[in-house]
Amino acid sequence: MRRAPIVYLIFMVLAAITAQGQHLVLVHPTVEYQDGSQPLATAEPRFSWNYQADVRDVRQTSYRIIVASTEEKARDNVGDLWDSQTTPSDRMLLIPYQGKALGSRDQAYWKVITTVTYRPDADVTSATGVLDTTIESKINYFEISLLGSDDWYAQWIGFNYDDDSLVQKTRIAARYLRKEFLLRDEIREARLYISGLGQYSAFLNGTEVAPQEIFKPALSDYHKRVYFNAYDVTRLLQKGDNAIGVILAGGRFMAMRYNASEGDWCGLNHTRHFGAPRLILQLEVTYQDGTTERIVSNESWQITNLGPIRTANEFDGETYDGRMDLGDWTTAGYTDYRWQRASSAYPPEGPLTAQPNPNICIQDTLKPIALFRKGDRWILDMGQNMVGYLEMSALGLREGDTVTLRFAETLNPDSSLFLDNLRSAEVTDRIIRGATNVHSKTERYKDAVTTWHPTFVYHGFRYVEITGLRTEPKPHHFRGLVFYDQMATTGRFETSDEILNAVHRNAYWGIRGNYRSMPTDCPQRDERMGWTGDRTTGNYGESYLFGNQRLYAKWLTDIEDSQWANGALSDVCPNYWRRYTDNMTWPGAFITVADMLHTRYGDEQAIRAHYPAMKRWMMHMKRHYLVDGILNRDCYGDWCMPPESLELVHAQDPARITRAAVISTPFYCYLSDKMAQFADLLSLPDDAAFFRNEIQVVTQAYNERYLDKKTGRYDNNTVTANLLPLAFGMVPKKMEEKVLANIIDKTENEFGGHVSTGVIGIQQLMRTLTEHGRGDLALKIATNDTYPSWGYMVRNGATTIWELWNGNTADPSMNSGNHVMLLGDLILWDYEYLGGIRALEPGYRRILLKPHPFAGLESVNCAYESVSGLIESSWSCKDGLFEWDFTIPANTTADVWIPTANGHEVKTYGSGQHHITSKIGTWRFWK
């Protein structure tokens, strides 16, 4: 959408103060943590900003938010929509709008004026006086999307074709829809509101709308809600004749695996099916004289499925037949006499909902590192297991030639593609060369270039097998286009240890590759689902790497949309598979993600919105499964525990298996503690007391049942059995040392200082060891490069994170090369314990800086771009001398734990850049 022109007061250029080389700038003004480029899905927006400064001890003392109906009024400080007046406050995150009621299509201009104090002197201990100044932001713009069903005048349209194949691996041709229309006058502005199910690409007068965005709109349970997008298309329209065109593909609206005779859509052979592709579109044009006109989807539109995209199944790939190219079908004057009239289509059950999160965008490009021939085919190596698609330029193809691209994460020993771990996914793209309008069909074909990439599918791959070429390809003929949900990279982490660095890099690639308008488990095989348990703890670490708040806030809606009337939640959200297993661990992400959004971004809204559904789920689990203080309900166990034999997927040895109640009962206490905190936040004292009483009663029953008070062992003494109650505060204080000793003994002596847990245990292992004084063991686990460890993956060529610790030897039936669930709390530990960056207050208004300089690690360079500003922590330790540079954002403070020879010293620091040197001798790890 459009933004207001950048306007500054003459005496406040860049909203900064500048004196003797010092400056203080108000930056990142956002509404709902958005920059105004996307219409808002709410009429109750919240305003945020932060600062950049090279002065110290910056404190905001007041703010004034002005919201106006025009840019001129905002410039003149006339807040005809809302003027907060000068408000004494240091608040700068998510301040709610409290002005005149806003509604669909409303546009507003806003700015903020703040007063701040700061200390200009570079010496933090100096007595130099505190100065104050006023800072004014640039004028910003926001717009409200369509919020109600009565805003829509369009109808759903489509067409059911007899040649659609809806058996098992569904095959349908893309739908092409078009409409020509006349605009009678010059245009002031125009908005396009559109939803195409399952996926769409839209064009106006031959130009694609938002070409950088793909896989639109965001995924959802279409029985609960259907997202639509909104665009400013003013520049794409003209007075006179115009044309609009839309391509539709099945996406997730049409099941990738389907059998109409099966009622249960659970598993690899049957995903959820909602129907054939359909479109709703509303183009609203405002003329220069202020009058308006709407162009809407209805039965006057033309449609065909005889275009070049013949199939587009997310699991199996896309086939593009250039011989069926439709020419300039998105421009006015096109002859469409062979097309059909579109039919009215049944609306999806879910209401149209303004999409709250950005779409997926291309955000990186890779060049191949190798290209070699194998028989009659070519093998391309991208050098990185990536998620996206391949763009190809081929020379000399003739009409009817077929180029086939197959994708894989790894190679067999003979350099052929290893495809066994893809299950039924065909992951094959095909392009058939059409007639050329550049050269005649003679010898000059060899000079013709065919450039192509798919539109509606993606792949998880490092290697590509290419067949059907007539000329020898070159590496520069190919590009890997990397895409994921649009978001900023917010974390930076580097150490003196190559394994830690490589694993962090692999995590970065794996996490972003599994953002597909939901956090997925994997990007390559016939699954690609939003498994909740993969993110129960992982979401906390991911949110250091990426500004993913809008993706995760949207995913919480997906989770609540999966809820049954009895309170049960699906393990997969959106619930394209029917996975209602009633266990505490996987759906627990519903609660932990909301906690993360509050902690990391200062956002209470997710807790307020979803608390009733969270409570229904907790009550459902208590009502059906909590007996005598024990909740004996778990489906997956300590998933992917390192097995005793390298060819196994799951451990068979009873000594490695943690029983259900020993997992689910501690998790019930853990989540009850989160719920009690939420109840405190929401001023629900009865709920808070209830959940805290649950913890007390269940903890007592659990310890009586499973804790051996002589040995300090829980149940069968697996690391996870002992770890969970210790991590969740359930172990009696006098028993903590014994329980910890059992964890250490198992990890060091039976596992040789390697990973000793599965998915559930690894979510708590690194932090718990460190909190109890054995961070040295955590570091050993993190830096090992032999099995089982993250470093073992690196040493065996992984460039992402495997699904299994033994991913290079295990049965390929469940052996993804790009899963993030095994990361557990590693990334969280990297930033919060090695880097030492933690939030003491939501949104990092107060910060804890507490790095852990373990022996064997010489340096850590860590940074996090929080919503309150940039936090940096970079330290080195050599010959007993600890040197530390850290940055505290403006308008925040930090409790700083300084390592000393005898332990630590704690000081409170204001904002700015600081340097500390401390002699710590040989003492190198601490709590």
Q: What do the predicted segments below correspond to?
A:
Residues 244, 320, 526-527, 545, ...:
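C-terminal capping/lid segments that line or modulate ligand- or cofactor-binding pockets
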Residues 1-7:
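Bacterial N-terminal signal peptides that target proteins for export
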Residues 19-21:
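Boundary at the C-terminal end of the N-terminal hydrophobic targeting segment
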Residues 199, 296-305, 463, 472-506, ...:
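Active-site acid/base region of carbohydrate-active enzymes
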Residues 190, 194, 204, 389-409, ...:
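Alpha-helical support elements that line or immediately flank enzyme active sites
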Residues 7-16:
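Bacterial N-terminal signal peptides
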Residues 271, 275-282, 293-328, 333, ...:
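Non-catalytic C-terminal accessory modules of carbohydrate-active enzymes
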Residues 24-107, 111-525, 533-534, 550-551, ...:
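Extracellular/oxidizing-compartment recognition motifs
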